[in-house]
């Protein structure tokens, strides 16, 4: 994992990542980095201060998505072939729960308060909303776009507004972004965008979505 100075736009050092790194997530204090290693079916935990590997955690097949809770107590990894969310205690570095979701989970986002987790399933064509306490699904969001084949609707990227009102979901080769009411979990509208939309991000003031 390469670390860049945002002012100079230059690489300042490298961190160990394990083989075939996919997504990664920092703890809120910035001291640890959780990296999914797809080929080895592990999550690598990196000490960002000492720039060394703390441990490696065995997970399911083809780990992909990675997120850390806002309070830093839990990390979650998605495994694309096993179809699980693996909940990892960041203190013990042990898996404490596995939540089954739809096929090929690719990305996860915690709500700003940390009480919910949103997980996209690319092949399943859904987004599951999971309660962070019970670790059980509380909603499954499906997508239907007039004139677009169901197989092309492949949700991946998710961004939640900081006020907790809306979720934006990139739908891959469907070439649309879904706007979802984050309270009712209902799709409000679909925005036509360019080809194969995957990941998303807001401008700092959240007035623009990229």
Q: Model-predicted segments: where are they?
A:
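Predominantly soluble domains enriched in secretory-pathway, periplasmic, or organellar proteins
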Residues: 1-210
């Amino acid at each position: 994992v390469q670390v860049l100075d945002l002012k100079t736009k230059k690489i300042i050092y490298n961190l160990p990542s394990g083989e075939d790194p996919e997504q990664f997530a920092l703890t809120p204090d910035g001291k640890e980095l959780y990296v999914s290693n797809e080929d080895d079916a592990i999550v690598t935990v990196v000490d960002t201060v000492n720039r060394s590997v703390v441990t490696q955690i065995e997970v399911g097949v083809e780990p992909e998505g990675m997120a850390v809770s806002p309070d830093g107590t839990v990390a979650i990894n998605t495994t694309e072939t096993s179809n699980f969310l693996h909940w990892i205690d960041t203190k013990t570095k042990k898996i404490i729960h596995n939540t089954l979701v739809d096929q090929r989970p690719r990305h996860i986002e915690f709500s700003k308060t940390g009480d919910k987790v949103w997980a996209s399933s690319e092949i399943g064509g859904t987004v599951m909303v999971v309660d962070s306490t019970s670790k059980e699904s509380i909603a499954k969001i499906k997508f239907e776009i007039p004139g677009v084949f169901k197989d092309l609707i492949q949700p991946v990227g998710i961004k939640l507004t900081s006020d907790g009102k809306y979720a934006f979901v990139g739908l891959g080769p469907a070439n649309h972004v879904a706007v979802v009411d984050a309270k009712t979990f209902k799709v409000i509208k679909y925005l036509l965008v360019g080809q194969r939309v995957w990941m998303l991000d807001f401008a700092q003031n959240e007035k623009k979505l990229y």
